[in-house]
């Protein structure tokens, strides 16, 4: 029986799952918008949102924890220098999952995962001027 077991297996070993979500989180922090399958998107929330919450308080210990979970210096830098400050007043819900149809090959439900309050291309150009 699988009573009170949380999380999705996604037909992968635990090491593969850990590496996959680590890579997806780094990609999300770098690009602020990624496209993936709906179950992966829902599970990515459980990995990425605690990292953003951790980044709201900048300390050496928190940076080391974030690096341990992402293994990417660039992602940790962006988390603490940009995203932590951006979401300092937000209590949670840093990600938005938007359904975007089905994949052509296997009809898998697809979704966009994006950071809430991310700057849109038009706003970035206007702010630069």
UniProtKB/Swiss-Prot annotation:
The record's annotation in Pfam families points to: Ribosomal_L17 (PF01196)
* Record keywords, A-Z: Ribonucleoprotein, Ribosomal protein
Gene Ontology CC: cytosolic large ribosomal subunit
Q: Which Gene Ontology molecular function entries are recorded, alphabetically?
A: structural constituent of ribosome
GO BP annotation list: translation
Taxonomic superkingdom: Bacteria
| Family membership noted in the UniProt record | Belongs to the bacterial ribosomal protein bL17 family.
Q: How does it assemble?
A: Part of the 50S ribosomal subunit. Contacts protein L32.
> What name does UniProt use for this protein?
Large ribosomal subunit protein bL17
Q: Which organism is it from?
A: Stutzerimonas stutzeri (strain A1501) (Pseudomonas stutzeri)
According to the entry, what is the taxonomic lineage of the organism? Bacteria, Pseudomonadati, Pseudomonadota, Gammaproteobacteria, Pseudomonadales
